[in-house]
Design a protein with these regions (language model features):
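N-terminal Rossmann-like FAD-binding beta1-loop-alpha1 element of flavoenzymes
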Residues: 88-112
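Extreme N-terminal leader/targeting segments of oxidoreductases
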Residues: 1-88, 106-107
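Glycine-rich active-site loop/strand segments that organize a redox cofactor
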Residues: 131-162
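An anion/pyrophosphate-binding glycine-rich loop and adjacent beta-alpha core
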Residues: 118, 344, 350-456, 517-519, ...
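Glycine-rich loop(s) and the adjacent beta-strand/alpha-helix scaffold that form part
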Residues: 316-370, 374, 502-513
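Glycine- and aromatic-enriched mobile tails/lids
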Residues: 57, 69-86, 117-119, 124-130, ...
Length: 620
């Protein structure tokens, strides 16, 4: 490796030397052969046809080019190959990636990749805020709100961890310089959004994501052990040898599962043919599992805007590269978010989960301009904005879960033959509009609408992906050495439909847990200690048992009412009562009906609850 191309920390050197030797031994040594063997040529096997056109980079041409708003990577397989070594490589520079880096010690070398620029991430776009457990009494209601919004398909273990970690996360953000809104007494202000039973959302005007992400990015830029590479697109992961047979087998199972409509894909399975290799396998890179698994991630393969290929060897790898919105014609996401990690996972036989769980946000600004849809925050409705039909009448309860409100809007549009409905701010004081929602106010003026004087046209748009790469409570995938966090991952927090303002919190909590687990694997001490017990205690434990039992009961009832597992079957009359019952709004709701909903799947067999063991937990 040339000195200018390496980034080796004190611990990274050991991992790099072992991984490079292992990779070269696997791929016969030549860089070109290594690159060729590491990437599947031609068409990938993406989870959906929508991803096939814009997910993992195809290798043809010689430079990375931009076509409109969508990145069109073009790489020459015979281009220069540069080797980089580090302890941890993080793919993505949103809040999950940044917070993981901040929770790693300075003794570890870290490389972060941004597909375009560091500020082109969906974390920057989050408007409404970030949830927090308001007080001790809020645990059960926060938990139940999350379950109701998710149609009780949530993984209870993950919901519990997120809620109990929330206050320490907010405190840490404040210490790092995040400026949340406060009242005159200096206390945090809270707003409310759809399906929340009480205000529990911290915010910064209507640009909370920008405030959090920009602050974390500034802190990361101060770290001498972190290197950020912009305009660097991940093509594949690097793995140790003996992968071919097992991963090809699992990739075929994944593809078959997707084609058959099964949402939980095949995981790595035991293969007796690999036993001989396991016994004779060389030592794994630093940070590897002591059991020496037959297949282990040891970094990523990527390419840069100048056409160079990068082999980034790392002891631990984190995928934090966002969702799939770039594959949709109308989305609030950046066009560069095209499900790259999910496509690689499908090809590599890494478990995926709930690939059909896509959230449609009820209110994006209707516009004939091309490009990303502009989100109208749900907190607008939480503060009093209402949806109106063509006659100026309300037609639904605006504070129901997002999927319910989106369905109601769609039905209204069909009934009217219209391309949008209207959102009125008439119930909101002007200073609240221009203060709390100043960014939305400004953007609407650019489109010719003054929201202090008139309703604005809104339409549903793809917004969030609840599925993704399946991970455990520490954000680890089923491939050793590989983690996933943020919208890339599926830890089960959101169930079938995400509760408003849970995305930033979930990303931060589980990115931090990934960092802690990496530190354990790398033998390093995390700079921020865990402040909450691994399992709920006292009143929280009792609420946890009750809510998990309720979730199991609801999923059994829904499965019985809706028939066999069929995630596309509509069952409005049977499932309609499972949505959150928000407090009544003062205005009448002419024409409102129970929205159609999609029947939930049966609970995943691996969605284990701790109800049996929670009484034995020793509380910290």
């Amino acid at each position: 490796m040339s000195e200018e191309n390496e980034f080796v920390g004190e611990m990274g050197a050991v991992a790099a030397e072992t991984a490079i030797a292992e990779t070269n031994r696997t791929y016969a040594g030549a860089p070109e052969q290594a690159a060729a063997a590491s990437i599947t040529r031609g068409e990938a096997n993406p989870p959906t046809e929508a991803m096939a056109s814009a997910a993992v980079c195809a290798h043809s041409g010689d430079t990375c080019e931009s076509s409109g708003d969508r990145l069109q990577p073009k790489c020459d397989g015979a281009a220069e190959v540069r080797d980089i070594a580090c302890d941890v490589v993080i793919v993505g520079c949103g809040v999950a990636g940044l917070y993981c880096a901040l929770n790693l010690p300075s003794t570890l070398s870290v490389v972060m990749l941004a597909k375009t620029t560091v500020d082109e991430c969906d974390s920057m776009l989050a408007q409404g805020g970030i949830c927090v457990q308001h007080d001790d009494a809020d645990y059960a209601s926060f938990f139940e709100d999350t379950l109701r919004a998710g149609h009780y398909e949530n993984r209870c273990e993950s919901v519990d961890l997120m809620i109990r970690a929330s206050r320490s996360i907010i405190s840490d953000l404040v210490k790092r310089g995040v400026d949340f809104e406060r009242d005159k007494a200096g206390n945090l202000r809270y707003t409310r959004e759809g399906a929340h039973s009480r205000p529990r959302i911290c915010f910064h005007s209507d640009i909370t994501g920008d405030e959090i992400t920009s602050t974390l990015l500034a802190r990361v830029r101060e770290l001498p052990n972190v290197r950020i590479l912009e305009h660097t697109c991940m093509d594949d992961i690097l793995v140790t040898q003996a992968e071919a047979q097992v991963n090809a087998e699992n990739a075929a199972k994944n593809e078959a599962a997707v084609q058959s409509g099964t949402t939980q894909n095949a995981t790595n399975v035991e293969n007796q043919d690999c036993a001989a290799h396991d016994a004779a396998a060389p030592a794994t890179p630093r940070g590897g599992d002591s059991r020496q698994p037959r297949t282990r991630c040891c970094g990523v393969l990527a390419h840069t805007a100048d056409g160079a290929q990068l082999r980034i060897f790392a002891g631990q790898t984190l995928w934090a590269c966002g969702g799939i919105g770039g594959t949709y014609p109308r989305s609030t996401n950046f066009p560069s978010l095209t499900g790259d990690a999910c496509t690689i996972a499908a090809r590599r036989g890494i478990a995926l989960e709930h690939m059909d769980y896509v959230q449609i946000h009820p209110t994006s600004l209707y516009s004939t301009r091309p490009g990303r849809a502009f989100l109208i925050s749900e907190s607008c409705r939480g503060e009093g904005a209402v949806l109106l039909d063509a006659n100026g009448n309300r037609f639904t309860d605006e504070l129901q879960p997002r999927d319910v409100v989106s369905a109601a809007i769609y039905r209204q549009m069909v009934a009217e033959g219209s391309e949008f409905v209207r959102l009125s701010f008439a119930n909101m004081p002007k200073d609240e509009i221009t203060g709390h929602f100043k960014n939305i106010y400004k953007r609407c003026l650019e489109e010719g609408f003054d929201i202090t004087r008139e309703p604005i046209p809104v339409v549903p748009a793809q917004h969030y992906f609840m599925g993704g790469v399946r991970v455990d409570r520490n954000s680890a995938t089923d491939m050793p050495g590989l983690y996933a966090a943020g919208e890339t991952s599926c830890n089960g927090v959101h169930g079938k439909n995400r509760l408003a303002s849970n995305s930033l919190l979930e990303s931060l909590v589980f990115a931090q847990r990934a960092a802690w687990d990496m530190c354990r694997k790398l033998g390093a001490k995390a700079p921020v200690a865990q402040t909450y017990p691994e399992q709920p205690c006292g009143a929280d434990a009792q609420a946890y048992e009750r809510l998990c039992a309720e979730a199991k009961r609801k999923t059994r009832e829904n499965a019985a009412k809706c028939g066999p597992q069929n995630t596309t079957q509509t069952c409005a009359q049977n499932v309609g009562q499972n949505t959150a019952q928000t407090e009544p709004r003062s205005a009448e709701q002419p024409g409102s009906q129970t929205p159609a909903q999609t029947c939930p799947q049966n609970p995943s067999p691996s969605d284990t609850d701790r109800t049996a063991s929670s009484k034995e937990v020793v509380c910290a």
